[in-house]
Regions:
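Short hydrophobic beta-strand element within catalytic cores of glycosyltransferases
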Residues: 288-297
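A short, active-site helix/loop in glycosyltransferases that binds the activated sugar's phosphate group
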Residues: 114-115, 145-187, 231
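Membrane-proximal helix-turn-helix segments that form the acceptor-binding/catalytic region
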Residues: 62-70, 91-102, 128-167
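Acidic donor-binding loop of glycosyltransferase active sites
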Residues: 262-273, 287-288
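Conserved donor-binding/catalytic core segment of Leloir-type glycosyltransferases
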Residues: 188-224, 230
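Acceptor-binding helix/loop patch of EC 2.4 sugar-transfer enzymes
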Residues: 39, 105-151, 219, 294, ...
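A charged, aromatic-enriched C-terminal amphipathic alpha-helix characteristic of glycosyltransferases
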Residues: 328-362
Length: 369
């Protein structure tokens, strides 16, 4: 079988493509390298600055199009698959839908139905747009709510892609829940894929201060809640300077980021949405992830035995107490580290995820005889 992925986020599609190749299939990932993040893609198509950059970008896609026909599945990363205005994106989407067997729209980040599910349906205890019943009113939430809910061309393209895609895929609990809320018959869940390295050396009792790591994308500080998390960590570090070591990585390339995180005891990730690739990377390295890990996320994976993540509440005092517990009792980290590795290998191993993804073909053929 032949798979084409257009657009990626945090190497999720690239890792899935690797799994599909190892299972004997063809897979191609086209997208950007994510500026400073330097993500992996098979074909890099990035838009340069100004009018010249836009023209070159358009020509590059036009030259690629004849080669992007005859795939069994074309998988689009929501509306982030190209850096064009919605009208032109629709033309490319419709062309690829016409000249390939099936198209899937995968939600890997923000999108109309995700924002709609958070803002209007209020599906979650916390999200990028709410904390309980209270709307978040920061600049990011206001701007994104307006863009995804009130811009006619964005809404129109979102509806068109959702209604004409053969399947919709959510890669995390919130993404799946929002798509399923609006399109229950055609929504599927496929976990994020993760390569699992050899058994890390730091599994076992924590020796010395607890090493806590946080990665920050400055332009997404408010969105992810890392502004609040950093404030809590600084307070914790001031209170227990001899019991913990605090490491911060800000806007560094992916490979360097992983090197900086290696050897940590705890990763403090994000505050409003469920765990994603960042937490999985850490867990695969034997690092305990402190993030949002609600019961519904485990249930979607059919996980009933292992719950290794530290579930962060959306309030500063609750976050402080959760992390303080492990700073004062580092001996309790060893089992959580072992469970973290086992959880990723059981639920997110890239070959197993690739097999789950391949199983979508059966549903596609059943729904489209």
């Amino acid at each position: 079988m032949k798979f084409l992925f257009i657009g990626d986020a945090s190497n999720a599609r690239y890792t899935l493509a690797k799994g599909l190749r190892e299972l004997g299939h063809e897979a191609l990932v086209i997208g950007t390298r994510g500026k400073w993040r330097r993500m992996n893609v098979d074909i890099c198509v990035e838009r340069g600055a100004g009018r010249v950059g836009a023209v070159v970008y358009l020509l590059r896609w036009l030259l690629l199009l004849p080669k992007l026909r005859g795939y069994d599945i074309v998988d689009f990363n929501g509306q982030f698959f190209m850096d064009f205005k919605p009208g032109l994106k629709r033309l490319f989407f419709d062309y690829l839908r016409k000249h390939n067997r099936y198209v899937i729209s995968t939600l890997l980040g923000l999108g109309h139905y995700y924002v709609k599910g958070c803002v209007e349906a209020k599906l979650f205890r916390s999200s990028d747009f709410n904390i309980g019943d209270t709307p978040r009113t920061n600049a990011f939430a206001s701007q994104m709510a307006d863009e995804w809910l009130n811009q006619p061309e964005v809404v129109k393209l979102s509806r068109h892609m959702a209604e004409t895609s053969h399947l919709l895929v959510g890669t995390g609990y919130e993404y799946w829940a929002c798509l399923h809320h609006y399109f229950p018959e055609k929504t599927c869940f496929v976990p994020l894929p993760m390569e699992t390295p050899e058994e890390p050396a730091n599994i076992g009792e924590t020796q010395g201060p607890v090493r806590i790591f946080i990665g920050i994308q400055k332009e997404r500080d408010e969105e992810k809640g890392t502004d609040i998390l950093w404030r809590v960590l600084q307070r914790l570090n001031n209170d227990y300077p001899d019991k913990m070591t605090l490491v911060r990585a800000e806007n560094v390339p992916y490979d360097e980021y992983c090197r900086m995180m290696a050897g940590s005891d705890i990763l403090v990730d994000q505050l409003y949405t469920c765990y994603a690739m960042n937490a999985l990377i850490a867990m695969s390295m034997g690092i305990v992830a402190a993030t949002v890990a609600i019961p519904e996320a485990y249930a979607l994976l059919s996980e009933k035995e292992s719950f290794p993540m530290i579930d962060l509440p959306p309030d500063e005092e609750g976050i402080y107490r959760q992390l303080e517990h492990y700073v004062l009792h580092p001996e309790r980290l060893a089992e959580a580290k072992r469970q973290s590795i086992a959880f990723v290998r059981k639920r997110h191993h890239y070959l197993e995820v690739a097999r789950q993804y391949m199983s979508l073909m059966g549903r596609l053929e059943k729904n489209n005889p």
